[in-house]
Amino acid sequence: MQEGLKLAERYNASLGSSQTYPIDNHHDKESSTDVATDDIMEKDLHSGKTISSQNSLDGSEASTPVHQLERPTIDVSERNDSRRKFRKKTSLDDLLDQASKFQPQYEYSFPTSFLRKRKAPQSNESDGEEEAKQNRTNKIVKQKKTKKNVKVTSKSKASVPIEEKHTINKQPKKTGTGGMKRGPKPGRKKKSQKNTKNSIKKESTNAINNHKMYEMDSASSRFAEHKNSTNSESANNSFIDWSLPKFSPPYQIFDIDNINSYSNFQGQIYSSASLTKHHNEIGSKTPFSRNRDGSKSPIDDGQGKLIGLRSILYPDYYEEYLMDYKKVNFRYDGMAEIGKIMEYVGRIYLPEKYQKEYKETVVDIYNTAYDNKDLALSISTVEKYNQFVGSIPKAEIVNHLAATKELPRSFLHDFLQIVYTRSIHPYASKLKQYKAFSNYVYGELLPGFLTDVYSKCGLSKNHLFMDLGSGVGNCVIQASLEFGCRESFGCEIMEAASELTEIQMREYSNRCKLFGFKQSKIDYSLRKSFINNEKVESLIPECDVLLVNNFLFDGKLNYEVTKLLQKTKVGCKIISLKNIRASGYTLDTVNIESVLNRLEVKKYRLDNNSVSWTHNGGEYFISTVLDRIDESLLDPQKRDRRNTHRPAKYTR
């Protein structure tokens, strides 16, 4: 009897203070006796002991084996559920829950970001609530008023101190594409929601969806350099943000000898007028094109005028442009491209003594005509431009270029854009012929991101650059033009991308002659995989910077990439969108000779508008091949942190 009561008391104590079952020493209540008896039976069933029957609790000494007892018909699951309901969650339970969560590892892990992260909806609080919050904040921390602290008043009258260096400036007024921007495609149009709390998010979504009709256009995402203007005059009267810092090319970017060798342009290019006509023809399934005012008009209605834009280095050559302010094509704006070329010519090619007059009589007038959509004034200004550049002796221009030490990066990026629009736009539909979510999915890294990552790798004119999966060749061409690599090499297996690589290389070579750029060695291995490729295997040991866009590589292909990296030299930089060495990788006797043990991996933040397949940012990695084992693999603390890292959650 006493032993049973003690067991019942012990069981109640284990349940905690949230719920206990009463034990009546006088046995006045049958309910408490039943519960206590059942608890005792439940414990002793597992121990194999014999316990007293119901009569034993009343004083009888008769005992019965456990297997001969008749268990009361009590639903144990319901009783346990009720106990769990009131039971407090302990720290041990939290640890068990965390340990039970799924953790992806190795090649099945997904790279952080690139997909929209789930965020709590932003609620529009009342003015009174925000003011109350602000008052509480001001009581805790009092901001000192200095020159660096300025206050910006929001719509809700809540003032927030912001440092001057973080102030967002307006974008230059004329952001005409001058060609299709290889930015991300606008996302799908979201369904309307009744919840008004997400109004801020809806406005930004609608702003993106309004441009969905222009399939591959993103005027502001092609070059990050054009975004934050701090010069009010530049914002109103220029196609280019001249306030951005210039850079010094690591080599003599202008080919002075080649410019002096030819008086006439030796080459054939795809003209702007041909590109404009192409976009007008495919812009609609009907024989109509959309005008700037939203109306439609026949494509061949005779409006607009063909006009030639004179080359600054070869006065005998004119590139044809179709000028028409009535029709607008958001994939390519030839008239904005004219404005950019005029400004670059004045700042880069013309000697300083001509620049002031040129700006006043050509650049400023064309900008005014573009703003007012004055076709007649635009045409007359182009004619004035042709006369002006034709009157300057070529020798003075060449001497000025030879002494040039700095250039705006936007000049090189816009030049690459001109090449891209002429060679890729007419055949862009071919790039859609691939299997989704496979190793053959096509995607591009944009020039702004490439400039940043190449600079981090220290790419220079003495380096060999390689791109495994080079697509249409953009990364290879930019490494050659902007950094002057001694050799830039790309490998591409897809037929369509390989064909467009050849077209782009022809256009690039001819455009370099027209603009006077020096061409470094560029080579490709097209329509072939980089696996078991003799040319790739011969160049890998000499490679200084290697680019692998492994965002959608499967485990098998990643394994083949690792085998190739085994031959890389010490100091080689490897750029990737997913970590070459998986988060769960550990050093053991089996993989002791693997190159993955000698990789020093650094993760960087990928800004928005860095890749073609999404507007969102993410992360990328630069791995350096060491001559020793990476210390992070030997440090237990770092190893534990690496193995327990959980990627962020994602939404569609």
Curated annotation (Swiss-Prot):
Subcellular location: Nucleus
Residue stretches of biased makeup (Basic residues): 139-150, 182-194
Keywords, sorted A to Z: Chromatin regulator, Methyltransferase, Nucleus, Repeat, S-adenosyl-L-methionine, Transcription, Transcription regulation, Transferase
GO CC, alphabetical: chromosome, telomeric region; nucleosome; nucleus
Activity regulation as described: Ubiquitination of histone H2B to form H2BK123ub1 is required for efficient DOT1 methyltransferase activity on histone H3.
Span of domain DOT1: 321-638
PROSITE patterns: DOT1
EC number(s) on file: 2.1.1.360
EC category: transferase
Residues given in the record as S-adenosyl-L-methionine binding sites: 442-445, 465-474, 492, 529-530
Domain of life of the source: Eukaryota
A Pfam family: DOT1
Biased composition (Polar residues): 49-66
Coiled coil feature spans: none
Disordered as annotated region, ranges: 15-90, 112-211, 281-300
Biased composition (Basic and acidic residues): 68-83, 290-300
Annotated InterPro entries: Dot1, DOT1_dom, H3-K79_meTrfase, SAM-dependent_MTases_sf
Further remarks about this protein from its record: In contrast to other lysine histone methyltransferases, it does not contain a SET domain, suggesting the existence of another mechanism for methylation of lysine residues of histones.
Protein family per UniProt: Belongs to the class I-like SAM-binding methyltransferase superfamily. DOT1 family.
Entry-linked PANTHER family: HISTONE H3 METHYLTRANSFERASE, HISTONE-LYSINE N-METHYLTRANSFERASE, H3 LYSINE-79 SPECIFIC
Primary role: Histone methyltransferase that specifically trimethylates histone H3 to form H3K79me3. This methylation is required for telomere silencing and for the pachytene checkpoint during the meiotic cell cycle by allowing the recruitment of RAD9 to double strand breaks. Nucleosomes are preferred as substrate compared to free histone.
Protein name: Histone-lysine N-methyltransferase, H3 lysine-79 specific
Source organism phylogeny: Eukaryota, Fungi, Dikarya, Ascomycota, Saccharomycotina
